[in-house]
């Protein structure tokens, strides 16, 4: 028999639930899991919420080593997390990039471009939440361009990035 005390932290929405309780948060939260496409799936859901709710959305993607038997199916060698605050209106001096999602080019069969840095590419491939690294790299460089993110192979998610001044 499985004890509830052994099970309660194994569900993927436990983090969101605990944070909501501790912070007294009354706003909705959504938890998405899509294997290696989880970051892109979360980003897509966050953008849809942003459009429908017309209020800021905090996207948090995180992974840590999975317990058995999940570890055998998808080993995660380290912990990784990223948070993006998405808004519909830029905030001068605070907004660092504009992300665009175009309907006809939102999904693509184009390949994900590997990271130039071998260590970052290894991290990107080995941890689902780290699939955000190409997007973060483009934002950090202050460059405009298109990033292709792992989603469901295929298609992949295409995101256009423009720096804000």
Where are these regions (language model features)?
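Short, conserved micro-motifs enriched in small and acidic residues
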Residues: 10, 36-40, 126
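Active-site-proximal alpha-helical scaffold in enzymes
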Residues: 32-57
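Conserved "HGTGT" condensation-loop signature of ketosynthase/thiolase-family condensing enzymes
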Residues: 2-6, 12, 16-29, 61-165
